[in-house]
């Protein structure tokens, strides 16, 4: 079975369920599966870079922001900012009387990036982050997860049919297949980022 579009995904889910009374629920199953994929998947295809000028304590994150990978100030030599908790950032502000300076720390506060010290000028910053997985719809018919890992999409949706399939033995199988798919996605990303299998040939010298 080939699954490359939103419509084909819905059709495959319907075939697996084999329940005419659940056809209207399939889009909901897909949406719930997408929410789970967002929590479980961290892949290099999600990685993005955003550059901005920071001159205030708070900066907005990109619209598709999911999670920080790295955050740097690139003005006057590139320097990474250290991620700390909101509590620790507040404590540092209190101990330093909220003094301004070159930003060295950041926290995610109310959906924004909060830096400390508060910038004493305008600095260029680069944010490397994981972007959200785009939702499928009748107009947005595919995304990178469906293109490269359709099995994960399929089983994530099938899992969420559970309330309608009481004591159906297939649910355990679908859950296991979903987890196996997630493991493969994340392992694929890790393998690419470390440069292959990690195996190296040892040459003997004479």
What role is predicted for each listed range?
Residues 1-206:
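Glycine-enriched, solvent-exposed interface loops adjoining structured elements
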């Amino acid at each position: 079975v080939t699954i490359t579009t939103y419509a084909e995904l819905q059709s495959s889910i319907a075939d697996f369920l084999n329940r005419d009374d659940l056809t209207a629920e399939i889009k909901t199953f897909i949406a719930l599966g997408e929410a789970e994929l967002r929590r479980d998947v961290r892949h290099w295809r999600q990685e993005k870079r955003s550059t901005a000028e920071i001159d205030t304590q708070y900066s907005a994150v990109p619209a598709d922001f999911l999670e920080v990978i790295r955050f740097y100030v690139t003005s006057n030599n590139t320097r990474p900012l250290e991620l700390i908790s909101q509590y620790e950032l507040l404590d540092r502000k209190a101990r330093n009387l909220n003094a301004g300076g070159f930003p060295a720390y950041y926290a995610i506060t109310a959906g924004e990036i909060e830096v400390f010290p508060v910038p004493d000028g305008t600095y260029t910053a680069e944010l490397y982050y994981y972007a959200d997985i785009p939702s499928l719809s009748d107009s947005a018919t595919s995304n990178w997860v469906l293109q490269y890992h359709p099995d994960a999409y399929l089983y994530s949706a099938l899992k969420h049919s559970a309330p309608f399939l009481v004591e159906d033995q297939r649910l355990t199988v679908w859950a296991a297949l979903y987890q196996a798919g997630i493991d493969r996605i994340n392992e694929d990303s890790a393998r690419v980022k470390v440069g292959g299998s990690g195996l190296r040939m040892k040459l003997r010298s004479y």
